[in-house]
Amino acid sequence: MVDATDPNTGNMMAGYVQGIVGQALQSGTQSSPIVQTHLLFNPQMKSAYNFVPGVMGLILMLICAMMTSISIVREKETGTMEVLLVSPIRPIFIILAKAVPYLVLSCVNLATILLLSVYVLHVPVEGSLWTLSFLSLLLIAVALSLGLLISCVVQNQVAAMIVSGMGLMMPVMLLSGMIFPIESMPAVLQWISNIIPARWYIQAVKKVMIEGLGMAAVWHEALILSGMAALLIGLSLKKFKERLE
């Protein structure tokens, strides 16, 4: 039986098995067995089963991080951020007010992707929607805090767009397992991929959405995403307070 969650890896593994069996048959030391290959989770080898979780991770990361950083930097460029900061409103509530619209937008995007995957691409959601939503909220929290951290470092919208857009798009696409299996990467790239939040999200979403597993199977990925979110939120708030001082 072959795990076909990733069609490319599934084909490769099936080919290896057939090659080993073929060598055993050529040796002539054993009777010819009947080889039956069973593809688990994705018997039709649809590529959509692989790229739908990847697209979810890519969109959530880019929209939250890029739009949040650009929005806050725009306020700094126009001078309205300073006006807001000298008001009686606490800075944390100002940041939350900027982040909430993109949180809602990301939830809408998540629902849209799931509807398209189920009704257009015919990729079922085998696991719990609550678990999938919880994992998505963790990634959104990571992306929002990363966008806030970027806005504290850069000085203008162009720089924010370059750092949050190009700086996140390529690592997410190449090092998260969205396109290339992580197991086939060089050891250095595998190590670097550990700090890519989308890697853990995509890995967990495949288990829940395609394999139908529950929270007990993705607690490791959820714990890593929670740690990343807490770390980035702490760094971004600290950096934001330093800029205020």
Where in this protein do the model-derived segments appear?
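Transport-system extracytoplasmic interface segments
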Residues: 1-67, 71
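Residue-level hotspots within pore-lining transmembrane alpha-helices
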Residues: 21, 57-61, 69, 73, ...
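Membrane-interfacial helix-loop-helix junctions in multi-pass membrane proteins
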Residues: 42-45, 124, 173-231, 244
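Transmembrane alpha-helix boundary and packing residues in multipass membrane permease domains
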Residues: 66-70, 114, 118, 148, ...
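Transmembrane helix boundary and interhelical loop/hinge segments in multi-pass membrane proteins
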Residues: 66-89, 99, 245
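Short helix-capping/hinge motifs at transmembrane helix termini and TM-loop junctions
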Residues: 69, 73-74, 87, 117-125, ...
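Alpha-helical transmembrane segments and their short interhelical loops
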Residues: 91-165, 170-173, 215-222, 226, ...
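Short cytosolic juxtamembrane segments of multi-pass membrane proteins
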Residues: 238-245
